[in-house]
């Protein structure tokens, strides 16, 4: 899980989701998981 000021999808399978007011990227590849904070 990376915490970044700007979250971007890295590959085609990355999905941007808003959860509890935080923007997250979820993906099949665990290295692509990100959240904004």
From Swiss-Prot:
GO terms for molecular function: structural constituent of ribosome. GO terms for cellular component: cytoplasm; ribonucleoprotein complex; ribosome. The lineage of its organism: Bacteria, Bacillati, Bacillota, Clostridia, Lachnospirales. Belongs to the bacterial ribosomal protein bL36 family. It comes from Lachnoclostridium phytofermentans (strain ATCC 700394 / DSM 18823 / ISDg). The gene is rpmJ. It holds the Pfam family Ribosomal_L36. This is Large ribosomal subunit protein bL36. GO terms for biological process: translation. Keywords: Ribonucleoprotein, Ribosomal protein.
């Amino acid at each position: 899980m990376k915490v970044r000021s700007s979250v971007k999808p890295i590959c085609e399978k990355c999905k941007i989701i808003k959860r509890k007011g935080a923007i997250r990227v979820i993906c099949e590849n665990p290295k692509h998981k990100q959240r904004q904070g």
